[in-house]
Amino acid sequence: MIKRNRFRCVLSTSMLAVGACCVVVPAVLHASSVAGTEIDTELDLLLTRTARDLTGRIKLLEGQVRSSRASASVDLARGVITVRLDRAFLPRDYGPAFEDQRSLIDNALLTVTEPYLHVSQVKYLYGGFDIYHYFPEVKQEDDKAREAGERIRREKQERQRIGIVTGSGVAFVAAGHGYYLDHKDRVWKTQREEHNGIMEGMLTPSYAAELKSALESRSQMPVYRPRVQGGAEAHPESGREWWRMAARYAVAAQYPGHPDIWNTHAGSAAHDREYKEDINSRPLLANHLGAEVAIHMHSNADDTGAARGARVIVQPGRSVDAALGASVLCAMKELIRSAPGYGDFIVASAPHAADKGENRLAAMPSIIVETAFHTHPEDAAALLDPVFRAASMKGVEKGYRLFRDGKDCTPLALSKIDRVTVPANGAAETNVRFDGHPQFPITLSFTPVYCTQPGACRAEEKTVAEASASPIKVQMSCEGSGYGMVNWSTVMRDADGVTSGPVEHWMTCQGGG
């Protein structure tokens, strides 16, 4: 029999790290197949009602006429919604206001489908044709940037193959929106209205600053932000503080010799031409700088105020950007849900594809991060919370870093801790195996579930500061000469508060001879 206090376990650790991929499979409704397309009639009716309701009351753009025959349906197998509208619903001009209008329709439709499946894209047909049929120049912009990006990647891969260091190593982080000059009334306007105490263009700089800090410290790369960062200095023409101004104006001040970046609508009579130039200036400047990645920070909006959660928008047809978006969402989910109070915060399971100028003109992997909906009261409260801001931006950084390094985003999990036998008054190592990519330092918490001698085994923690890969080498010690067994329940927690589930493992202390 073991005497009390003669059997005590002491733990010390050293460490090493690994990852794998996880796939989220959406649930579907009761589906039937028509001409090779999986459909759900009831869901299509809901989508059609939603599309008709919104297009029947949404603010029309110049040249638009209400669509009398709006309908919508979803291909369950492909996860794509198709919206069919009259040709008369086309605006006179394709620009950011039209993209914003479609985003409101997208978000209303996605709110309908979210409980059942992930929709990757909402496509629109106007009189039976897609938007590029009427605005071929938009498709040409997309094709030009896509081809440039593919050429840059091929050249980079070839230089790497022969041992030449390539790339600028710069990340481009753009805070969306800000003040612009509307030439209709010659008034300086914000690109977004206030909701729940949030003006999007005044919020995004704080998120861009948070992400910049995380990228510089963790991804070890310089970051360029096109909007002015803080300070009380006033923009001369508007009288507003510089940090409140849209990126276009800071870019014009810094690059006066490159109107091809910030004055892309020179000669246009459109009242919102500087708004359009602001959208264009961000990706065009990223191209000019040769940035490795472009991340555009936004908050989201919904007409009904019902939509919630974080989303990432990528350009349709760009698989590299989609891979980056998926990695960012995966890491955002892990980091946000590890933050106090956000354990059930909604994060999209995969990116959404939508044609947006910020991504369309970019020749590098480019994503729009819609961190939360400022039109929903609880999401808005989260957006104003420094805890949420830090967690979400650490998630964006981690997702990018894993993508850059060719690693899959895998949730942190302890997979196995080997059983070990320890000599009396001695120590022995065992392996702690884990999945995922924890942020160091990490803490291992050991709690006894069963102990041969009750009270002889006590819970302990050990912190490991040096980053390494799985498996962790854990030195486990027995004090005293008595024989005993312990069943431990162990949890790993990283520096960001990401915690694994518990795993149980056994240790035997050999008695002295």
Spell out what each predicted region is.
Residues 496-513:
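Short beta-strand elements
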